[in-house]
Curated annotation (Swiss-Prot):
Any one GO cellular component localisation term in the record: periplasmic space
Species of origin: Salmonella schwarzengrund (strain CVM19633)
Lineage: Bacteria, Pseudomonadati, Pseudomonadota, Gammaproteobacteria, Enterobacterales
Complexes and interactors: Homodimer.
Active site: E241
Kelch repeats: 51-95, 97-149, 151-186, 187-232, 235-284, 306-355, 357-386
Name of this chain's protein: N-acetylneuraminate epimerase
Length: 386
C-alpha cells in the first residue's frame, strides 16, 4: 500500500508539472526559415542589432546571417570563413565584430583531426574576416564561452589538446589494421575521467586589449560539450562530458562581479520521467525566457554512469548513443521537467533574442545534421515550442 501511495504521489506531481507548463504551439513565437544547409557541430552568435550569424560545422566554411528585425526574414550568405572547415568552435560578438575561437578540423585532406587554438574575427560592416594576432592558452575544442560585456568573453572547459590529437594520430596510423585500430580505440576510452585532463581553467579574453587572463578554476571536474548561459551577471555551466561517453548532471553556477568570478552552490538536472537517474547531457540547447532557464535536447549514453560507478572505465562500451528530446526549466530556483521537443536533437546552435530561445540546426537521432529552426518561449507559465 505504501509503494502504491508513493507511485500515486509521483504520478500526481508529474501531472501537476505537465499542467502548469504544458507544451503548445503559438502565434506568439517567431517563425524562422530553415538554414540554407544542414548544420551540426557549428557555432553562432547574435549581434546587438538582432542579427543572428551561424556557420562552420557541417556547413564547412560557410556562414549565414538573418535579421530578426526585418518583416521578411531570410538567411543571407556572408563571406566564407578563411580558417578552414572546423567543428565545435565558440563564437561571440565583441566590439560589434564576430569572434570565433578554436575548434577541431584537418589542415588538409591527408592530415588527422587536430585541436585549434586560433582566433578569427568578422566585420559585418566590411564583410571581411581577419585572423587575430593571438592564440588561446590551451587548445579549444569542446569548450564553451559566454559574453561578459562588449569587450570580454569567458571561455572554459574542453578536451586536452595533446591527448585528443594523439588519439587521432594513432587512429590514422592504424587505419589499415583493424585489430590495431580497435586496440587504439579501447585504450583511449578505457581510462578514468581524471586521465583525460579536460580543461578546468576559466579564461577571460579581452578583445580591446587582445589579452588572455586566468580567472581561476571550475569548482569541480573539467567538462567538454557543456552548454553555458549568462543572465544578469550569473553564469550557468550546464552538464557536459567528464570523459568521452560519460556525462555529468551537475550544473555549475557563478556570479561575475567587479571582474571576479565567485562560484555558488551547484545544482543537478533531474531525471527524465521513467528514468532512475539523470545521465547528464552533452550538446544541449539552452537559454532564458521570462526568467526561466530552459535546457533541452543533447545526447548521452543511458547506463554509462552506472557502468563507471561499477568500475568500468570504458563506460559507454556497447551502449547506443541516445539523442534526447526532453526540456527542463529552472523555475523559481528549482529544476523541473517541462515536456518534449518536436524531435530528439543536439549539437546545434542556441541563440537568445528577447524572451525567445532559437534552436538552430543540430543532429537528429540518426546522427544526421538538420536545417530546421525552432524556438522555446515561456508564456503565462507555459512552454511554447514553435
Amino acid at each position: 500500500m505504501g509503494m502504491q501511495m508513493k507511485n500515486f504521489k509521483k504520478m500526481m506531481t508529474l501531472m501537476a508539472l505537465c499542467l502548469s507548463v504544458a507544451i503548445t504551439t503559438s502565434g506568439y513565437a517567431t517563425t524562422l526559415p530553415d538554414i540554407p544547409e544542414p548544420l551540426k557541430n557549428g557555432t553562432g552568435a547574435i549581434d546587438n542589432n538582432g542579427v543572428i550569424y551561424v556557420g562552420l560545422g557541417t556547413a564547412g566554411t560557410s556562414w549565414y546571417k538573418i535579421d530578426l528585425k526585418k518583416q521578411h526574414k531570410d538567411w543571407e550568405r556572408i563571406k566564407s570563413f578563411p580558417g578552414g572547415a572546423r567543428e565545435q568552435s565558440v563564437s561571440v560578438f565583441l566590439n560589434d565584430e564576430l569572434y570565433v575561437f578554436g575548434g577541431v578540423g584537418k589542415k588538409n585532406s591527408e592530415s588527422p583531426l587536430q585541436v585549434y587554438s586560433d582566433v578569427y574575427k568578422y566585420s559585418p560592416v566590411k564583410n571581411t574576416w581577419q585572423k587575430v594576432d593571438t592564440i588561446s592558452p590551451v587548445g579549444l575544442t569542446g569548450h564553451t564561452g559566454v559574453k561578459l560585456n562588449e569587450t570580454m568573453v569567458l571561455i572554459t572547459g574542453g578536451v586536452n589538446e595533446h591527448i585528443f590529437d594523439k588519439y587521432f594520430i594513432d587512429i590514422a596510423a592504424a587505419a589499415a589494421d583493424e585489430s590495431e585500430k580497435n586496440k587504439v580505440i579501447y585504450n583511449y576510452f578505457n581510462k578514468p575521467a581524471k586521465d583525460y585532463f579536460f580543461n578546468k581553467i576559466v579564461f577571460i579574453y579581452n578583445a580591446k586589449e587582445n589579452t588572455w587572463k586566468n580567472a581561476g578554476e571550475l569548482p569541480g571536474a573539467g567538462t567538454a560539450g557543456s552548454s553555458s548561459v549568462m543572465e544578469n551577471n550569473f553564469l550557468m555551466l550546464i552538464n557536459g562530458e567528464l570523459k568521452p561517453g560519460l556525462r555529468t548532471d551537475v550544473i555549475y553556477r557563478a556570479m561575475w562581479d567587479n571582474d571576479k568570478l565567485t562560484w555558488l552552490k551547484n545544482s543537478q538536472l533531474p531525471p527524465s520521467p521513467g528514468e532512475q537517474q539523470q545521465e547528464g547531457l552533452a550538446g544541449a540547447f539552452s537559454g532564458y525566457s521570462h526568467g526561466v532557464l530552459l535546457v533541452g535536447g543533447g545526447a548521452n549514453f543511458p547506463g554509462a554512469k552506472q557502468n563507471y560507478t561499477n568500475g568500468k572505465f570504458y563506460s559507454h562500451e556497447g551502449i547506443n548513443k541516445k539523442w534526447r528530446d526532453e526540456v527542463y526549466g529552472l523555475v523559481n530556483g528549482h529544476w523541473q521537467y517541462m515536456g518534449k521537443m518536436k524531435q530528439p536533437l543536439g549539437y546545434g546552435v542556441s541563440v537568445s533574442y528577447g524572451d525567445e530561445v532559437f534552436l538552430i540546426g543540430g543532429e537528429n537521432a540518426k546522427g544526421k545534421p538538420v536545417s530546421s529552426v525552432t524556438s522555446f518561449t515561456m508564456r503565462d507559465g507555459n512552454l511554447l515550442i514553435k
